[in-house]
A protein has these predicted regions:
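An N-terminal-biased, well-structured beta-alpha scaffold segment characteristic
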Residues: 17, 21-111, 232
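Rossmann-like dinucleotide-binding domain for NAD(H)/NADP(H)
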Residues: 110, 242, 248-337
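Glycine-rich, N-terminal phosphate-binding loop of Rossmann-like dinucleotide-binding domains
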Residues: 72, 92, 219-221, 248-249, ...
Length: 337
């Protein structure tokens, strides 16, 4: 079996021949730079690489596909045309959006790029915290009005940071916050030994204590059913009135109307939001107009140089897939992570 040659575009098909000469067909549904595609050709000499777009791939090609590397979720209408699909690798660490009914129902292994977004998420969280306490939104508003307004910034040293979800990103944030002199407390899904940079660590039972103690609460959760509405009215009222909520990953962790009410009525001081139940956030959402809210368009986890971080995981999993070995970052499709 061979693949026709084309120049790289938005998608690519890789026909991989294993040592037993059994072919594997991998669809690269991502916009890889030419240099990276060339490197893949050299690393996998038995693979013929050709590029196709979604519209250009015909039924005969789809039937041969064994694996897909994608940035956007695969619609079930495409998955249904790939009877041999056995592996789906995605560019994100969180994979819930990719677990469509067809993907979940079939014997398709799903792997993600978990572990590479910690630095960018942690930096973004700190940027939000510092912007809020240093009154940058108020300064920008005053600048637009050409108004010389005296404000009183607050120091973060000695303040308590509560991290809900001490995974890769939460751990990176904890390390950085501790280096800045903050007290760090956190929750984790399962009980593990406490790392040195965390002052207190617990599981879900620890959440009320974390909310009551924290000056900043950062949500770094997988968007899965077990985390939906994890922050309700009782939890918001446990927080200090001077506390800030930063939500970077759990768009459905808190209901939007409830959060709006909490912000308008002063249950908490403010929020920075990069994750929403409705994305993009609709223009008619009241969140846009609240003065104590920073809204960003789902950019917290985007690295400026993503391929150097993502490709090593894909290349290793491609090697494992063609060799019949266990895949790295394999997702439990029932749990969603």
């Amino acid at each position: 079996m061979s693949c026709p040659h084309h120049y790289p575009s938005l998608t690519a098909i890789i026909c991989c021949y294993t040592k037993t000469h059994m072919s594997k067909t991998i669809w690269l549904r991502v916009a890889l730079p030419e240099t990276d595609l060339s490197a893949l050709r050299k690393e996998f000499p038995r693979c013929e690489i050709t590029t196709e777009t979604d519209d250009a791939i015909g039924p005969a090609q789809l039937e041969r596909i064994d694996g897909v590397f994608t940035e956007e979720a695969l619609p079930d209408s495409l998955v249904e045309q790939m009877p041999n699909l056995r592996w789906l690798h995605v560019t994100r660490g969180g994979v819930s959006a990719y677990l469509t009914p067809e993907v979940k129902a079939r014997s398709i292994q799903v792997t993600g790029s978990k572990g590479i977004h910690g630095a960018v998420f942690s930096e973004f969280a700190l940027a939000c915290i510092l912007a809020l306490v240093k009154k940058l939104p108020e300064c920008l508003q005053a600048q637009e009005q050409r108004k010389w307004q005296k404000l009183v910034p607050v120091e973060i040293e000695g303040k308590t940071l509560g991290i809900i979800g001490l995974g890769t990103a939460g751990s990176e944030l904890g390390r950085k916050a501790k280096a800045l002199g903050m007290r760090v407390i956190a929750t984790k899904r399962t009980a593990t030994p406490k790392p040195d940079y965390v002052d207190e660590l617990g599981t879900s039972d620890f959440l009320p204590h974390l909310l009551a103690e924290s000056d900043f609460v950062v949500l770094l959760l997988a968007s899965v059913p077990s985390t939906f509405n994890i922050i309700g009215e009782n939890e918001l009222r446990m927080m200090k009135r001077s506390a800030y909520l930063i939500n970077l990953t759990g768009g459905r962790a808190i209901e939007e109307p409830l959060l709006i009410r909490a912000l308008k009525e002063g249950w908490i001081a403010g929020a920075a939001l990069d994750a929403f139940a409705r994305q993009p956030l609709p223009e008619d959402s009241e969140l846009w107009s609240l003065p104590n809210v920073i809204i960003t368009p789902r950019i917290a986890g985007i690295p400026s140089q993503k391929w150097p971080a993502m490709l090593p995981i894909f290349r290793e999993n491609l090697r494992r897939f063609t060799a019949g070995e266990p895949l790295r970052n394999l997702v439990d499709k029932e749990l969603g992570y």
